[in-house]
């Protein structure tokens, strides 16, 4: 096996090396520059993961595959060019590269695996060449600065019809990734499905209009859209509604609220809603007050995850299905009020560090331990 070392911040990869092994430079915080010789054909999983000082990497045209997590967590990396020789960009390959502003995916790349560029929060634009025929789940999820998405004309699998700033799977009319440009998104009327995380952390997005042809919306499709203040579902949509002008997407048949927003700081859930879906209010950072009606019997995981301004919650008596992480990462919660006969139930279902906040309706504010 070739011997690898770092000299003056530069990775020394001997000429003749065919593969950079898994985790070869994992966590090397002193590494700033990587120049890969043209003998290398594969970059292993986690090869440069968590190299937090890495600012520059040159990927030669000999590389055919970039492994899973190869550059994940390289938070100082600002740009990368994926050459035409690369056929596969692995799962989470550049996950969490928060300083990455420019990505060039060259014509010749065929597959971008799940979460390959997840959390690249400085990325502003994406161009998908016509050679890319496979895009995994949440590839560009949580890319909060994204304002431009273009798919090359002639791509046989994907398109960005009507200049919609989105990636759409042509055959199924599924919108798999969208963005705000700068504050609104127009979903083409031909779209029938929105994939999970499609608009995750589009922090500039202020309003969403769901056309009547959209009959499937994936989990957390709009999670972390912290500027979102208006949600409207078109009349006559057979699956979803936004009843009572409630600024939410509700699954009509099950009365499940799957996405809400803060407008601007408080939200009243309609009294007909019986379930609050996974991640329904996740990342609604400005939300300070939530009114949950007595009709609600189920609160799913991450329902209010990361609602960092939320202070007071009143929970109803009828809840029988409650997941422990429903209010995870709500650091400013002062009180969780519950009916007398449900206090013990909620204390059993909340994490230990939050149980002191749960008090009976009408009680004084609890004192944090």
What residue spans do the PLM features occupy?
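Short glycine-/acidic-enriched loop or helix-start segments at secondary-structure transitions
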Residues: 324, 347-348
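Structural signature of tandem-repeat unit edges
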Residues: 1-19, 29-42, 52-65, 75-88, ...
């Amino acid at each position: 096996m070739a011997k690898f070392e770092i000299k003056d911040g530069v990775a020394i990869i001997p000429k003749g090396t065919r593969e950079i092994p898994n985790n070869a430079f994992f966590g090397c915080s002193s590494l700033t520059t990587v120049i890969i010789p043209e003998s290398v054909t594969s970059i292993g999983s986690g090869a440069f993961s968590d190299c937090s000082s890495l600012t520059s990497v040159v990927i030669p045209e000999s590389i055919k595959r970039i492994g899973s997590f190869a550059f994940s967590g390289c938070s100082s990396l600002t740009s990368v060019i994926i050459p035409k020789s690369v056929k596969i960009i692995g799962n989470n390959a550049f996950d969490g590269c928060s300083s990455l502003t420019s990505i060039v995916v060259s014509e010749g790349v065929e597959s971008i695996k799940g979460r390959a560029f997840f959390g690249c929060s400085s990325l502003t634009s994406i161009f998908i060449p016509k050679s890319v025929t496979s895009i995994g789940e949440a590839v560009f999820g949580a890319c909060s600065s994204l304002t431009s998405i273009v798919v090359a004309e002639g791509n046989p699998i994907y398109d960005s019809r009507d200049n919609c700033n989105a990636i759409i799977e042509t055959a199924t009319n599924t919108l798999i990734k969208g963005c705000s440009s700068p504050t609104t998104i127009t979903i083409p009327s031909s779209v029938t499905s929105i994939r999970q995380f499609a608009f995750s952390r589009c922090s500039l997005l202020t309003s969403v209009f769901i056309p009547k042809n959209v009959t499937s919306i994936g989990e957390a499709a709009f999670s972390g859209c912290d500027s979102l203040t208006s949600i409207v579902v078109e009349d006559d949509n057979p699956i979803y509604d936004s009843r009572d002008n409630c600024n939410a997407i509700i699954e009509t048949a099950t009365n499940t609220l799957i996405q809400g927003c803060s407008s601007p700081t408080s939200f009243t859930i309609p009294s007909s809603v019986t379930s609050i879906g996974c991640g329904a209010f996740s990342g609604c950072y400005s939300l300070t007050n939530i009114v949950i009606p007595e009709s609600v019997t189920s609160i799913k995981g991450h329902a209010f995850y990361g609602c960092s301004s939320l202070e007071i919650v009143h929970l109803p008596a009828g809840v029988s299905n409650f997941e422990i992480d429903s209010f995870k990462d709500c650091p400013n919660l002062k009180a969780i009020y519950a009916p007398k006969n449900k206090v013990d139930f909620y204390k059993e279902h909340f994490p230990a560090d939050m149980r002191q906040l749960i008090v009976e309706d009408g009680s004084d504010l609890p004192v944090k331990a």
